[in-house]
Amino acid sequence: MNEGEILFQFTTWLIFLISYLIGSIPFGLLLTKLAKLGDVRTIGSGNIGATNVLRTGNKKVAALTLLCDILKGTLVILVIKFLTDPIENNIFISLAGFFAFLGHLFPVWLKFKGGKGVATYLGVCLGLYWPAAIVFITAWIVLFLITRYSSLSALIAVIITPIFVHFSYPYLYAHCILVIMSLLVMIKHHANIGRLLVGKESKIGTQNGGK
């Protein structure tokens, strides 16, 4: 391996590390503390995501948490797209988004106990291939309006989105990474799935349990 290849490998992994660290920023925890709403990990499901932040009763902080968690996935990809050829480096761009997603799920700052990845998943879709984000949002909204279950809406959305990408986006690497991300979201929702199956999952607006 020559000097140029070593530098390339170092730069690549450095970018992946930075992407992971950006994804690891626990906005739900930070914003609730800044708003003096307490530790979101002691509220509802104990999750640091926007749905659980909403259970504090502060819709503005919940919305800001959602936006920040989405942007973690989007900005990482858009910056790299701006600096490189988005077609030639599609796998590199996809992996950077994946590392940001992993950071949200397993943040080093919180002993690797993070969120469930739904918002950052959406952010990666938005940065990588915006029509996928539209499909995700549409699926989530339709399911939520029907069921009022945030968790179920997210689970259906992460199933539909990779299927859409498979038939509409030409880059296999991105599709494979999106499938892995969908599986991780499902794994993170294992408790929600259990509650859904026995009819004990809480809907948006309740104060306990849920996503």
Curated annotation (Swiss-Prot):
GO terms for molecular function: acyl-phosphate glycerol-3-phosphate acyltransferase activity. Pathway: Lipid metabolism; phospholipid metabolism. Keywords: Cell inner membrane, Cell membrane, Lipid biosynthesis, Lipid metabolism, Membrane, Phospholipid biosynthesis, Phospholipid metabolism, Transferase, Transmembrane, Transmembrane helix. Its EC number is 2.3.1.275. Its main location: membrane. The chain crosses the membrane at residues 10-30, 63-83, 90-110, 126-146, 152-172. Disulfide bonds: none annotated. PANTHER family: GLYCEROL-3-PHOSPHATE ACYLTRANSFERASE-RELATED (PTHR30309:SF0), INNER MEMBRANE PROTEIN YGIH (PTHR30309). Catalyzes the transfer of an acyl group from acyl-phosphate (acyl-PO(4)) to glycerol-3-phosphate (G3P) to form lysophosphatidic acid (LPA). This enzyme utilizes acyl-phosphate as fatty acyl donor, but not acyl-CoA or acyl-ACP. Belongs to the PlsY family. This is Glycerol-3-phosphate acyltransferase. It comes from Bartonella henselae (strain ATCC 49882 / DSM 28221 / CCUG 30454 / Houston 1) (Rochalimaea henselae). The gene is plsY.
